[in-house]
Amino acid sequence: MARFSSAEVLDAVLRYPVVPVFYHADVAYAKRILQACYDGGLRVFEFTNRGANAFDVFSQLQTFVQEQCPDMLLGIGTIYTAQDAERFIEAGADFVVQPVTTAEVAAACQHNDVAWLPGAMTLNEVYNATQLGAKLVKIFPGNVVGPGYIKALRGPMPNVKLMVTGGVEPTNESVSEWFGAGVNVVGMGSQLFKNADDTQALVAQISGLMQFVNSLPK
């Protein structure tokens, strides 16, 4: 089961608002990436349920985190069903991320006091997610709507916590634009891991990025 309550996870995500979104079928490689993210200063990591052996890899990563990266929150992404949510929660998922919003997954997370991050795009979808209890809503895909959309959404919904994924680049310019538009958290996938084979370079890149993010006005 999760090591942290839903409220504790939400607080941590807002304090460490850069979330890597990652999947790889090779456990050893996934461990190296997770360790590099940890060494670079990240404390929230989303492993996605996108491969046939995702559960096995996730389970081994969870053990690795508890032994080597105890302050890292490890969550599972790309969850569509309550059955999958329950399975990964049982394996220790600290949070559950969806590309969509389903009441069944919301209920499974809430029953276990596990943070639930549903996916939405339209104003109506964001509102419906909050009505189901979401404290942080994922806007996806970000590259389709752009930062201008976030600014517009903030007009009628100034208080909803938002995380954007898809199209966020690991550059000062990109993250400054998104945070300036009003997001609370950014998720980064393939853009962050383009040269991931060089883990020392990845650590340095993440460290510099986190220093910049922490310098932005809150």
State each model region's role.
Residues 1-83, 87-91, 180, 199-218:
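Conserved N-terminal beta1-alpha1 strand-loop-helix module at the mouth
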Residues 17-22, 45-47, 74-77, 96-98, ...:
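Hydrophobic faces of well-ordered beta-strands that scaffold small-molecule active sites
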Residues 38-43, 89-96, 111-117, 131-136, ...:
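Glycine-enriched alpha-helix->loop->beta-strand junction motifs that scaffold or abut catalytic
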Residues 49-50, 79, 100-102, 121-122, ...:
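Short, ordered loop/turn segments at secondary-structure junctions
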Residues 81-91, 125-132, 149, 168-186:
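Catalytic cores of alpha/beta
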Residues 95-105, 139-146, 182-202:
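Glycine-rich phosphate-binding active-site loops on the catalytic face of alpha/beta enzymes
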Residues 99-145:
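Histidine/lysine/aspartate-rich catalytic loop segments that bind and position anionic ligands
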